[in-house]
Amino acid sequence: MSIADESLSAMQAILSGMTSEQANRAPALPGANSPYAIGAHCVGMADYWGGSLIAGLRIPRDRDSEFRAQGDPQQLCVELGRIRRLIPGHAAIALTEGVRDRTTVGTTRNATDREASATWMLLHIVRELSQHLGQLEITRDILASADR
């Protein structure tokens, strides 16, 4: 899970260097998300797949609100750090016990994904974090370019 940790660490580095105004502004592009919303979605996604499904923790999730989320980027960095600390434990559960709770809801993916293997779920977390790190990097660069 070192790739997940690297992605989360890089997200923290980007967001910690932003003011609230910078973190909460989306590029002027259709459907674009703010850096804060991207990070909030990553927290929600990891809490859902790792915490709720794999670990059985039943963490409430409102996926749609993740993309409208606004707040202090420093506090979001704390949440990303929490996810960094939890992922190794979720991976251990996945590899030793499998998935503890397949009934939880909180994703737009189809219901059959909740029947996927624990390994698939871990790989999904890694893929999503890597994908959204790239999105965050591009978003940061677009916003910086617009400020010049």
Per-range role (PLM):
Residues 68-106, 117-125, 130:
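Acidic/histidine-rich alpha-helical segments that form the ligand environment
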